[in-house]
């Protein structure tokens, strides 16, 4: 029997991450586009020859694919657990049964100071984080004494759906 999803949230990267990635992709493609005459004001090369940047294109394709697959954090709360999944393909997943949760609360924290940034991170102080942007999170106090921060735009909306200890 499948547990019913009681709450679901998708949190994507900040706008500036998208802008930086777009800039890098365009900067990498610019030389070839110029050689083909696809940039206004630059004359087409008489002999563009074979694509000299094939390894670069391959690298860009892999980066764009990786970015597309890993572009968001999905948080789901079911009747029995919290489920985390990274990306559209949900290749990286984590399940936290309510029986392993001792407490849950919404917090404001410093991702840079506490974890060195965003993403899936670990701290030497027994804390870990799954975040994509911002400084708001659902903090889960786990039975083993560790804490898990789950990035959220509005973590206070998640708290009522969590039943610590499986109650």
Predicted regions and their residues:
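N-terminal membrane-targeting/pre-transmembrane regions
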Residues: 1-49, 129-130, 142, 147
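Interfacial helix-start motif at the membrane-water boundary
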Residues: 49-57
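Transmembrane alpha-helices and immediately adjacent membrane-cytoplasm interface residues
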Residues: 56-72
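Membrane-helix interface/capping segments
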Residues: 71-87
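ATP/adenylate-binding site constellation spanning eukaryotic-like Ser/Thr protein kinases
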Residues: 79, 98, 155
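Non-transmembrane, membrane-adjacent beta-strand/coil modules in membrane-associated proteins
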Residues: 84-149
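Cytosol-/stroma-facing membrane-proximal "stalk/adaptor" domains immediately downstream
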Residues: 148-167
């Amino acid at each position: 029997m499948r547990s019913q999803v009681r709450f679901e949230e998708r949190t994507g990267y900040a706008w500036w991450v998208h802008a930086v990635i777009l800039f890098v992709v365009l900067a990498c493609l610019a030389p070839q586009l110029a050689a083909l005459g696809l940039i206004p004001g630059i004359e087409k090369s008489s002999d563009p020859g074979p694509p000299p940047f094939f390894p670069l294109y391959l690298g860009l394709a892999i980066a764009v694919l990786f970015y597309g697959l890993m572009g968001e954090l999905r948080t789901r709360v079911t009747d029995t657990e919290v489920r985390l999944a990274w990306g559209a393909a949900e290749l990286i997943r984590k399940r936290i049964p309510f029986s392993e949760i001792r407490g849950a609360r919404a917090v404001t924290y410093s991702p840079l100071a506490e974890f060195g940034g965003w993403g899936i991170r670990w701290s030497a102080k027994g804390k870990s984080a799954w975040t994509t942007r911002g400084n708001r999170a659902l903090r889960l106090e786990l039975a083993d004494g560790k804490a898990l921060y789950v990035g959220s735009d509005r973590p206070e909306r998640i708290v009522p759906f969590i039943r610590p200890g499986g109650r």
